[in-house]
């Protein structure tokens, strides 16, 4: 099966790269021949429908191809496309990809593949290929300008299996103010039950797991900030939330073993080697797992 047939299912693609093909379709529309007529309202529906048709049914192999096509497109498009159109088009593509991966599929395997394919770009938050830092709209709308990052969305929905992957890749450690993620996990209103594999998830239990995972990354968690929010009338999703934050994160001295984990992970993060670099260290497997936040 060719690359285009794997990606497009029943829709044939005239070019090997799905994003180049989309641009060609946009250019061929008579209403878009003049630059002054370009804008989200003109071509966003077509881009979204095309990518949604792919992402709705795509498997991991097809998603790998789609990400490879997007990376190749972004790396070359800047030289060939009008600047504003290029920015708008890539924003629509990123918004659609993140929406389907995080809000619709919620599949850890897809999230990990996305991180693997784009980890080399994650240090530049402004780059279109640093997908994990881009914003998207969880309830899909054309413009992602008022959206949220994948990490914040996962914290809001308490998807602990996906949060663990993001943390293993050092995404929380790269946050400027990681306590905001803890506050979101604990205090964000739970409006819906999350479906995973057609089963209802216990959000409270997932929230507990999320707090434990964050405690494996952070050296301190400000209880004062949490209590300040509670004093303003906000309600925690977990009544006994303090039981899930080790006392060594807010009161007692931090464990030496945990401080070593933080230091080693920070060095690996600086060299963009999380999490794979952990498993090249000549240490026992149990310590590798500890560094990888398994315990």
Swiss-Prot record:
Gene3D superfamilies assigned: Ankyrin repeat-containing domain
Highest taxon in the source lineage: Eukaryota
Pathway where this protein functions: Protein modification; protein ubiquitination
Record carries keyword Cell inner membrane: no
UniProt entry keywords in alphabetical sequence: ANK repeat, Ubl conjugation pathway
Repeat region (ANK), residues: 146-176
One Pfam family named in its UniProt record: SOCS_box
The SOCS box domain, residue ranges: 232-295
Keyword check for Cytoplasm: no
Physiological role: May be a substrate-recognition component of a SCF-like ECS (Elongin-Cullin-SOCS-box protein) E3 ubiquitin-protein ligase complex which mediates the ubiquitination and subsequent proteasomal degradation of target proteins.
Domain notes from UniProt: The SOCS box domain mediates the interaction with the Elongin BC complex, an adapter module in different E3 ubiquitin-protein ligase complexes.
Name of the protein: Ankyrin repeat and SOCS box protein 17
Organism: Bos taurus
Lineage: Eukaryota, Metazoa, Chordata, Craniata, Vertebrata
């Amino acid at each position: 099966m060719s690359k285009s047939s794997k990606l497009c299912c029943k829709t044939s693609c005239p070019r090997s790269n799905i994003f180049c093909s989309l641009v060609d379709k946009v250019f061929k529309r008579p209403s878009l021949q003049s630059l002054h007529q370009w804008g989200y309202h003109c071509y966003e529906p077509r881009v979204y429908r095309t990518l949604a048709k792919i992402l709705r049914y795509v498997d991991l192999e097809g998603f790998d191809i789609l990400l490879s096509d997007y990376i190749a497109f972004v790396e070359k498009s800047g030289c060939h496309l009008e600047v504003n159109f290029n920015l708008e088009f890539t924003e629509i593509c990123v918004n659609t990809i993140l929406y389907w991966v995080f809000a619709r599929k919620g599949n850890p395997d897809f999230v990990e593949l996305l991180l693997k394919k784009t980890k080399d770009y994650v240090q530049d938050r402004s780059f279109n290929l640093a997908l994990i830092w881009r914003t998207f709209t969880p309830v899909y709308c054309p413009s992602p300008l008022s959206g949220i990052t994948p990490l914040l969305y996962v914290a809001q929905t308490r998807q602990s299996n996906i949060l663990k992957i993001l943390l293993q890749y050092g995404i929380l450690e790269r946050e400027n103010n990681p306590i905001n993620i803890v506050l979101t996990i604990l205090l964000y209103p739970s409006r819906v039950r999350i479906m995973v594999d057609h089963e209802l998830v216990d959000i409270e239990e997932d929230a507990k797991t999320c707090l434990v995972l964050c405690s494996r990354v952070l050296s301190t968690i400000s209880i004062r900030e949490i209590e300040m929010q509670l004093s303003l009338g906000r309600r925690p999703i977990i009544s006994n939330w303090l039981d899930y934050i080790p006392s060594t994160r807010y009161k007692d001295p931090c464990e030496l073993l945990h401080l070593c984990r933080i230091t080693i992970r920070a060095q690996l993060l600086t060299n963009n080697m999380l999490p794979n670099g952990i498993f090249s260290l000549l240490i026992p497997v149990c310590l590798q797992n500890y560094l990888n936040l398994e315990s």
